[in-house]
Each structure stands twice: as structure tokens, then as C-alpha cells.
Amino acid sequence: MPVKSFYMKKLTFSLCFLLVSVLSIAQYHYRDSNRIGITVGVNQFTLNTDNFETKPANGWNAGLSMRGNFYNIWDMVYAIQFSENNFSVETNSLTSLQEEVNYKIPSAQISLELSYVLVENHLSIEFGPLVQINGKSKVQSGKENNVISGTTLLAKDIQDINKFNFYPTVGLTAGAKHFRVNVSYQYGITNMFGNLNSNYPNNNLKANPGILNGNVIIYL
């Protein structure tokens, strides 16, 4: 098993175990004020960069969260979410044909958000910071040696993205006590291509991800 893959799986397992432990303890001591949520949904990932042409694509989300009373009409939401983020890049094949090459990024997010409750158990606005831990991006099979349009880079050259990204996020949650829908937007303020500039200093690569999420939350 590759070393990076092993450590990614080990980190994922550790994060899950930590969150489940915290949620279980909190649920035991504060049954009247805290609720565990199971989250599933979809995302649209956009890679914002001036270096070359990209297109957004859809991926999936799954995770756990805990919503608890914080102060008056404020709640606090702790969450961990696992995702697959997808996007495509304009390239030229070895036969000089233009092709869109797809990329997949496995990731895990840890977030801590304040929630302003507009209607108790039905409507709230969330905002706060989150950290995303990225695996190595996977380029579409057979397209690794395509040349990214407008550059001298190959498709495989931009796989080693930053392992950590910081996102401010804002969202809206609506529904019933035990079933809600959440829509949120996250914008990465760190350069996702920061790692690549040491290998390709003349390209001055810079990219900021934006993620639109649509999730269903089932509260236990």
C-alpha cells in the first residue's frame, strides 16, 4: 500500500473515531440540547485560477455533525464531512485535439460553525471556519500526458495539491426537527497550488477552490 494512501486512511479513521467519541459523550450528558446529525449530499467544486481554463463538476458528501445550544438564539455546529470533489481542465492531447481532463480530489473537512436560529427546529443561518484535508488529486486515466492549454504543463503535473486548505463558509438550514436540508458555500483562501510553485516557479500557479454544497441532514 502506498505510504500516502496509508496515512490518509489512518488519518480518516482517527478523525472518525474522535468525532464519534465526542458526539457520544456530549449526547449522553446533554440529551435535551444536543443532536447528532447524519449528513449526505452533493457538491459542485470550482477551481478558480487565471493560469488555465477549468470547469466545475459535481461530487458527493457524507458525514456526521452535532448541533447544540450555545447562547440564547445561537447554536453551535461541529461537523466532519468526507467528500469527493471533481473538476475538469482544458488540455490538448498528443494529437493536438482539445480535450477536457477530469480530476478527482478525496477530502475530509472539520468545521465549527455558529448557527443563528431564525425559527426554532426549522430555519437557521450558519457561518464559520473549516479546515479541509486533501488527498492527492487523481487525473483521468489515459490523459496524464495531455498538455494543459496555454501552458507547458502536463495534466499529471498539477496532481500534488496542498494537503490543507482553510475555508470560511456560510449556509442556510431549513426543515423539520429531525429532517433538514442545508445549502452552503465555501471559498478557499489558501493557494491550492502552493506546493507546485517549488517545482514550476516560472508558472506562478495560484488557485482558490469554491464549493457549493447541498446536503440532507437526519437528526437522531
Predicted segments — roles?
Residues Q27-S65:
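Short glycine/proline- and aromatic-enriched beta-strand/turn motifs that initiate or cap beta-hairpins
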Residues M1-T39, L212, V216-L220:
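Bacterial Sec-dependent N-terminal signal peptides
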Residues I38-V42, A62-G68, I80-F82, I110-Y116, ...:
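Residues on the lipid-exposed face of transmembrane beta-strands in outer-membrane beta-barrel proteins
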Residues R31, N69-I73, V119-L123, K177-F179:
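Outer-membrane beta-barrel channels and translocator barrels
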Residues L47-T54, E84-P106, G135-I161, M192-K206:
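Flexible, solvent-exposed loop segments that connect beta-strands
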Residues T54-Q98, I218:
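Glycine- and aromatic-enriched membrane insertion/assembly motifs of diderm outer-membrane
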